[in-house]
């Protein structure tokens, strides 16, 4: 089972070591294809899930991640990284954790392909968050990092920009 996210998008230096150093010369960072990797702290759990998904005696996988875009994204990334092929995949969509609701969800499980648009929207949202965060954090840090650190009388640090962070904190 997944315990939250097991897979994440790779940092720019995984594409090319030149991106490890923050510089205006390497911006904007816009990869043609996105790279993913297992989150180091959950590698053991990923290997367990990968082993279960790829068991030869399993022909149907019931996807029971949270019912929503993020749950869909979590499973699709794990299946992608685990190399799941040739299995029937059914999506269990439930609104509560009662036994009755869980049984209904299993009985009425749809082919995973019925949720392809939801999956596509999740991948798109993740790519947008990634590109905005990587590029704007680097631009603002390179341009204003020293000024902000001097003003706050703190050690130089990155200025983080993100979709959720920016609106929640009012930045």
Question: What is each of the regions a protein language model found here?
Answer:
Residues 1-138, 167-170:
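Intrinsically disordered, low-complexity regulatory segments
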Residues 129-171:
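Prokaryote-biased recognition of long, low-complexity C-terminal linker/tail segments
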């Amino acid at each position: 089972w997944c315990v939250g996210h097991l897979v994440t998008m790779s940092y720019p230096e995984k594409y090319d070591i030149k991106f490890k150093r923050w510089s205006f010369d390497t911006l904007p960072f816009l990869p043609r294809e996105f790279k993913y990797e297992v989150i180091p702290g959950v590698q053991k759990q990923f290997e367990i899930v990968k082993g279960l998904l790829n068991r030869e005696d399993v022909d149907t996988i019931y996807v029971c991640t949270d019912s929503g875009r993020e749950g869909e994204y979590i499973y699709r990334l794990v299946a992608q990284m685990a190399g799941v092929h040739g299995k029937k995949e059914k999506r269990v969509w439930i609104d509560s954790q009662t036994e009755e609701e869980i049984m209904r969800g299993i009985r009425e499980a749809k082919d995973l392909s019925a949720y392809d648009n939801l999956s596509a929207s999740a991948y798109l949202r993740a790519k947008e968050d990634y590109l905005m965060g990587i590029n704007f954090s680097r631009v603002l840090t390179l341009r204003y990092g020293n000024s902000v650190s001097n003003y706050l009388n703190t050690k130089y640090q990155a200025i983080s920009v993100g979709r959720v962070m920016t609106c929640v904190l009012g930045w």
